[in-house]
Amino acid sequence: MKLALDGMGGDNAPKSVIEGALLALEQIPNLEIQLYGQQEKLEPFLKQHDRLTIVPCEEVVEGTDDPARAVRRKKDSSMARMMDAVDEGRADACLSAGNTGALMAGGLFKVGRIEGIARPALATTLPTLDGKGFLMLDLGANADARPEHLVPYAIMGDIYAKKVGGLQKPRIGLLNIGTEDKKGNELTKATFDLLKEANLNFIGNVEARDLLEGVADVVVTDGFTGNMVLKSIEGTAGALFSMLKEAFMSSTKTKISAVLMKNNLRDLKHKMDYTEYGGAGLFGLQAPVIKAHGSSNAKAIFSAIRQANTMVEHTVISTITETVRHIEID
C-alpha cells in the first residue's frame, strides 16, 4: 500500500508524524510512505528507510487558514500535494493531522466523491466499555443533512464494520432522543423509515447515554449532532481521569489504593484511549482520506496509518462504490 502522508499537519508535527510513520514501516511489511513537507523541518527527525520517500513542499496549511482558500491557493502545501498524489494514482490513500476543514475540502475537490454519495461523512471508531468500540458517522463533515444522506452513511458504516471490523451482521443504530419508533425530529423520523426498509441489520433508535455500553456497532447521525457527541465523550473522558487522579492523590490511603488498582486503571485508560482507534475517515470519497487527531502522538499516527492500510487491503472503497451503484433512495 502506498500512503501519502502530510508531515506538517498537527500540533506535534513533524516529530510525531515521522515517529509514527517509522513505527508503521516496521510493523506493516507492504507499506510504502511518501512524506510531504518542508525538508529542513523534517530532516532533524528522519531516519533512512528504503520504503520512506521525502517529497519536499514549500507551503503549509495552517490550522487558522480558511479551508477552501487554503486548498486552492496553497498548491505546494504538504496537504495539497499529498491529495494530488492520490488523485493522480501515485498513492492509494492519504493521511493528515492538520486542518480538518481543508482536508475535507481538498478531499472533495481533488480525490472526488463516489457516485451516488451526495455528501461524504466523517467517521471514526469510538470506545466502548467492552473494548470493541463502535463506528459513528457523521462527526462534522455536514452540519445539515437530509434522510437521503443518512442512509448512505449507514450503508458505508455497515461495509466498514464488515470489512475492517470483521462483523457478519453489524448492528446499525440511529442516534435519537429516545428508542421509540416515532421519537425525534423530522430528520430522524424520515431516516428511521428509510433505514427500516434498507437491507441492513437496523436495530432502531439508540440514545447517547447507551453508546459507550456498545448498544450498536454503527451509529448514524447528522454532522452537527455527531460532532457534539464526539466532543462530549472526549471531554467527559478527560474530566473523569482528572477527577480519578485527584481522588487517588488526596491522601496516603488513596495513594496506596491507586497502587493496588494500577492494572485496572491502566486497562480502563487503554479502553478510552483515542490513540488506539486510528483516525477519522472521510467516507464517500474515491480513496481513503484519513484525518488523524490534531494532537496525535506517534502512537495515534501509527494507528491511523494502520487504519488506512486496512481500508486499502480490504477494498472498502470499491465495495462501497459497487454497493451504492445499485441502490435507489427515495
From Swiss-Prot:
Pathway(s) this gene product operates in, as recorded in its UniProt entry: Lipid metabolism; phospholipid metabolism
Gene Ontology biological-process entries: fatty acid biosynthetic process; phospholipid biosynthetic process
Catalytic reaction annotation: a fatty acyl-[ACP] + phosphate = an acyl phosphate + holo-[ACP]
Pfam family, one: FA_synthesis
Keyword Cytoplasm among record annotations: yes
Coiled coil: none
Protein's cellular compartments: Cytoplasm
EC supergroup of this enzyme: transferase
MF term (GO), any: phosphate:acyl-[acyl carrier protein] acyltransferase activity
Key words, A-Z: Cytoplasm, Lipid biosynthesis, Lipid metabolism, Phospholipid biosynthesis, Phospholipid metabolism, Transferase
An annotated GO cellular component: cytoplasm
InterPro entries the record matches: FA_synthesis (IPR003664), Phospholipid_synth_PlsX-like (IPR012281)
EC assignment: 2.3.1.274
Subunit text: Homodimer. Probably interacts with PlsY.
HAMAP family: PlsX
Biological role stated in the UniProt entry: Catalyzes the reversible formation of acyl-phosphate (acyl-PO(4)) from acyl-[acyl-carrier-protein] (acyl-ACP). This enzyme utilizes acyl-ACP as fatty acyl donor, but not acyl-CoA.
Family, similarity comment: Belongs to the PlsX family.
Designated name of the protein: Phosphate acyltransferase
Species: Lysinibacillus sphaericus (strain C3-41)
Gene: plsX
